[in-house]
């Protein structure tokens, strides 16, 4: 009996230790929701939890589709680097954007701490897709940065890429010191076009994995897939967000969907 109780306690402790920090997520939402200038807040539901998303429509009369943006580790859908520049700029190229809040942990959490949360992101991605489908969007592109890319790849590995028209991975493969990736990216099995984009001043793990990612994309054999390096950019594209937006927009513009 004692052994059973100890096992039950450890299981509960493990579950609670890896559950998303909903209180911190709420604080992030409270901080930004009234500060949104471009776009509008949309509350989507997944796993009986409402999470913040920011929808920014294109002004063009004939939209090309919509882009779902997944931010990096511990951030929010209007983060100053990567997320906000993409969500506010891509509408000018004919794309609606929907930047969603991903599960977060405390600020000090590392890659290994976030691995159990990858599965929690899946229902949010699916909810975002369902929302866009309900508005009549046909082509949906998933754009994911850093930890968001890990979460996106976890979802693709289990769900497939049938519900998206293309995928953009930004700074893919980032982890922490002596914390190797727990899950391989399913790039070789993807059917949709893939853009792998990263900066030349990236984290070592992202740079070291670049040839492996390119080989996997070539194995998938989609002629529209590309790997692009932004000179001088670090993992967060600080002071290089303009180049990031330009590269992503140009790649999206040439897609034959």
What do the predicted segments below correspond to?
Residues 42, 48-52, 57-133:
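Serine-hydrolase catalytic machinery in alpha/beta-hydrolase-like enzymes
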Residues 20-60:
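N-terminal cap/lid segment of alpha/beta-hydrolase-fold proteins
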Residues 77-79, 107-110, 151-153, 176-180, ...:
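Extracytoplasmic/secreted cell-surface and envelope-processing proteins
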Residues 4-13:
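Sec-dependent N-terminal signal peptides
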Residues 14-18:
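N-terminal signal peptide c-region/cleavage motif recognized by signal peptidases
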Residues 166, 171-229, 234:
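The feature captures the conserved acid-bearing segment of alpha/beta-hydrolase catalytic domains
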């Amino acid at each position: 009996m004692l052994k059973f109780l100890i096992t039950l306690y450890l299981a509960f402790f493990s579950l609670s230790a890896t559950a998303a920090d909903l209180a911190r997520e709420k604080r992030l939402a409270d901080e930004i929701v009234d500060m949104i200038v471009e776009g509008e807040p949309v509350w989507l539901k997944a796993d009986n939890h409402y999470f913040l998303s920011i929808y920014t429509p294109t002004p063009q009369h004939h939209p090309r589709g919509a882009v779902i943006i997944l931010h990096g580790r511990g951030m929010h859908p209007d983060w100053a680097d990567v997320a906000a520049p993409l969500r506010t700029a891509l509408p000018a190229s004919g794309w609606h954007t929907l930047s969603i809040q991903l599960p977060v942990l405390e600020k000090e959490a590392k890659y290994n701490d976030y691995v159990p949360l990858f599965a929690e992101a899946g229902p949010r991605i699916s909810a975002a897709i369902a929302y866009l489908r309900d508005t009549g969007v046909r082509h949906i592109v998933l754009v994911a940065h850093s930890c968001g890319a890990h979460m996106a790849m976890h979802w693709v590995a289990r769900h497939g890429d049938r519900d998206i028209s293309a995928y953009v991975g930004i700074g893919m493969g980032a982890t922490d010191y002596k914390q190797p990736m727990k899950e391989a990216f399913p790039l070789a099995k993807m059917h949709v076009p893939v853009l792998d984009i990263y900066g030349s001043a990236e984290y070592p793990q992202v740079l070291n994995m670049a040839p492996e990612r390119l080989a996997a994309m070539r194995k998938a054999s989609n002629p529209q897939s590309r790997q692009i390096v932004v000179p001088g950019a670090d993992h967060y594209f600080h002071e290089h967000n303009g180049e990031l937006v330009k590269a992503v927009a140009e790649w999206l513009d040439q897609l034959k969907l």
